[in-house]
Amino acid sequence: MSSLQSTELFQQQAYINGQWLAAQSNATVPVSNPATGEEIGTITNMGAAEATQAVEAAYTALQSWKALTAQNRADILLAWHKLVLDHTDELALIMTIEQGKPLAEAKGEVRYAASFIQWFAEEGKRIYGDVIPTVNNQQRFIISKEPVGVVAAITPWNFPIAMITRKAAPALAAGCTVVIKPANETPYCALAIAKLAEKAGIPAGVINVVTGKSQEIGSVFTSHEKVKKLTFTGSTPVGRLLMQQCSSTIKKLALELGGNAPLIVFDDADLDKAVQGAIFAKFRNAGQTCVCANRIYVHDNIYQAFAEKFVQEVQKFKVGNGLEDGVQIGPLINEKAVLKAQQLIDDAVSKGAKIACGGKQHALGQTFYEPSVLTNVDRTMEIVQEEIFGPVAPLIRFTDEADVVVQANDTIFGLAAYVYSENISRLWRVSEQLEYGMVGMNATAISNEVVPFGGVKQSGVGREGSKYGLEEFMTIKYMCLGL
């Protein structure tokens, strides 16, 4: 990390109540570079005691933070936004070293992350109440919106900066305070963002970052009475557990969980646009996103032509360390992810699938996997039923519109789906039938700060981004005035 221009962004201690602290036990855990396996540094290994300390600090800070005007909070958030953009290169470098994604993608994520801070800083000034016409001339009915309170946020490793700002920015804009538990694979991004928040003048206790023992810290988040909302991005099994644990204190919940996104290409689609859209939807971040095209359904009439063009594009990818020029596919997060990709491919091949390209660990070894395409895939294979989270694209043949909609919906997940067709009636008809929280019609780059991100079914509850994402951090109060 010596190449960082601003070494103060590389923090190895947690951030609680405006102070950089070690665990009470002084214990640490190592953090490794997934591309090389080398140790980057360590983080302090905190547990329940420190998590409780952070929650109490957030609760104390809440009273003064929510008392500020929306404009006051916006000014501070916009200062944070500027600092994030000013430090794009340093933040991206930290991200690539600890997460693995190519440097160009990391820089894109920093800008994406900053957009949420700016959006919610401005949107926080447009939190409106209501006046309800009376049913009784002796009374008046007034509705106000108030911050929910202390928010606990558990964030993932695949987008280690954007998933923090997408949660923290609306919380702060609404007048809440936040305690963040980042993934142990990517803690330095979270700590760097906290350092910039400190420099921007966000008061002590308003943002806190606790690193270390996930289960202990998570248990405090779910059981502490002063935590009024839990927001989590991660796997569906962990989301179910957190929801269950929160039941004892009846918290507000936002869960952004797993996906199994279908991408449907009809025979009237623009083939080149569909291929490029599928490439982006499948291979961004080496396939490690919850909205990745997990199942690519292609109409029988164009299946062969699509497969040929798609494979040609996949074979052009440069795989390597994300710090190297021109690299488009970095490592997977760990060797377990490589093993999962291989197991899914082996299962599919054993049931009749064909490997069009890739299909094995990359010659670079370790956590690198070849961008892969499978043909002759069908619904009996595990790769159709599970979230892949790797650079493997299964191509599935279909002939009937109604049947492909049934296949696309045949999953417990409901996060994102994509449809390609030049028939506008078909686009609307199919999109309305798809049981997903988000549908891209002739588009796969669908996420930004102004639209609501989230799913249905076991892909979660709640929305992030947009005006709806701000409402997630507020409660409604009804006041009745007697005359």
Predicted regions span which residues?
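Hydrophobic face of amphipathic alpha-helices that form TPR/SEL1-like repeat modules
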Residues: 1-35
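Conserved C-terminal structural/oligomerization subdomain of aldehyde/semialdehyde dehydrogenase
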Residues: 36-42, 227, 264, 318-319, ...
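Glycine-rich loop-to-alpha-helix module at the N-terminal edge of alpha/beta enzyme cores
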Residues: 38-127, 138
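ALDH superfamily catalytic-core signature
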Residues: 237-378, 441
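Rossmann-like NAD(P) dinucleotide-binding subdomain of oxidoreductase/dehydrogenase enzymes
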Residues: 129-273, 398
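Short, well-ordered beta-strand elements within core beta-sheets of diverse protein domains
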Residues: 39-46, 61-67, 153, 263-266, ...
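Residue-level signal for inorganic ion chemistry
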Residues: 37, 73, 95, 117, ...
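Structural signal for hydrophobic packing residues in well-ordered secondary-structure cores
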Residues: 62, 66, 81-88, 92, ...
